[in-house]
Amino acid sequence: MDSDQLPAAQNAEGSQSSEVDSGAMRLDSAPTDPVAAWFRQFTPYVHAHRGRTFVIAFGGEAVADPGFPGLVHDIALLHGLGIRLVLVHGARPQIEERLAMRGAEMRYVNGLRITDAPALASVKDAAGATRLEIEALLSLGLANSPMAGVQIPVASGNFVVARPLGVLDGVDYGHTGAVRRIDQKSLRARLDQGAVALIPPVGYSPTGEVFNLAAADVARSTAIALGADKLIFLVEGEGLQDAQGRPITHLLPGDIEDLLAAQGTPPMSEDLSAALRAGLDACRSGIPRVHLICRRRDGALLRELFTRDGAGVLITDRPLEEPRAARLSDVPGILSLLEPLEQGGVLVKRSRERLEIEVNHFQIIERDGTVIACAALYPFPEDGMAEMGCLAVHPSYRRGGRGDRLLKHVESLARAQGIGRLFVLTTQTAHWFRERGFEPASPAALPMAKQALYNYRRNSQVYIKTL
């Protein structure tokens, strides 16, 4: 059985409470309007994202897709919500189409195009036409359309200073280049004026040359130069899976290195590999969150940005949902986990004031600012013992080992305080604790101070674990 699927709840004794499953009881309430509920879930993210800078990268495949106008509508919504946007687009299929029309050779080495003079002409043509197509969609304002009444200024320019890639491993890449720097001052000025910045996959040198660039590298360099809050890649594939075939939703830098080093079956697509490499570098360069989202899924961009569980892969430089000490500001979230059980009589009712006094005993796991699990540690140092209480997990998050993580975290805290034994009181979850090394004991084995508070009517079972 999964560690977070606790079948019932531990009882509270005296002034302290113990293990509960916050989904153990469902209390009747007035039906919730689904539209109102959606707005309530959506609103905190609106406030969190307003005024932030997001760099969004997508390939030329997205632009060529008949569904691209829908993605543009979603991007326009982000702008309307006060998010500062930089769009970086690719143009590979558009370039290849023009090369084919001209009968020119298409040559790639290590995923990079060899850009000779004929290829550069196709790059310029395709990049310019693709940029104009995106600008036209962002300018759409027809009545009875999602863009009705919307006016979005679009800024393009020579924001990217580039250099030639040169000769690598004996291969002359011609007019293929690399980003030298981003004119972040000019770019910031356009964003400050309320414009959406649109950057094609080309760069310019101080000598007036034009270079063909990889869109992922342009996006990465732009995000780093601006100190963006998010770097978002809209990729072609359906995402990543672990060895058991489960979707991967979060990656750390080390995880990405392992993925890139492994020989995937089937092999990883070029755009996904490029996005992972760029995301890894951006993460290590201070970008707090990098997102990989399948652009083919309708609404995936909005779901990733405005729901707690998202719709893609999140890259961060530190683990998500790390247990931490609760703060006073976490009290409302802890109450939301415990109140249903208190109302149902599973736990002893506690006031907000009392929880505020005891909050220093609590450890929590949060997700996007929402407390999704909690536990408390009440030491009895004179007896070398401590009680673990209030181990509760949000009903939507019981399949991720969060109960085990909190238990291990609390055990570690107890050891650090010189505690040798940890005890719990329960009526219905004894097997869960037995599986994790707790042994049955009698109330007489409890610290004297706890024995004085023991409720014999509830007749909770006592379980003790030697640390």
Protein language model annotation of sequence segments:
Residues 318-348, 459-462, 466:
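Short amphipathic alpha-helix that is part of the acyltransferase structural core
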Residues 391-399, 428:
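A short, internal acetyl-CoA/4′-phosphopantetheine-binding micro-motif in the GNAT/acyltransferase core
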Residues 349-393:
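A conserved beta-strand-loop-helix scaffold within acyl/acetyltransferase catalytic domains
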Residues 100-198:
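Ligand-binding beta-strand-loop-alpha-helix segment within the catalytic cores
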Residues 68, 116-146, 184-185, 191, ...:
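Polyanion-binding loop/helix "lid" in catalytic or ligand-binding cores
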Residues 412-427:
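Conserved GNAT acetyl-CoA-binding A-motif
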Residues 399-412:
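Conserved acetyl-CoA-binding loop-helix of GNAT-fold acetyltransferases
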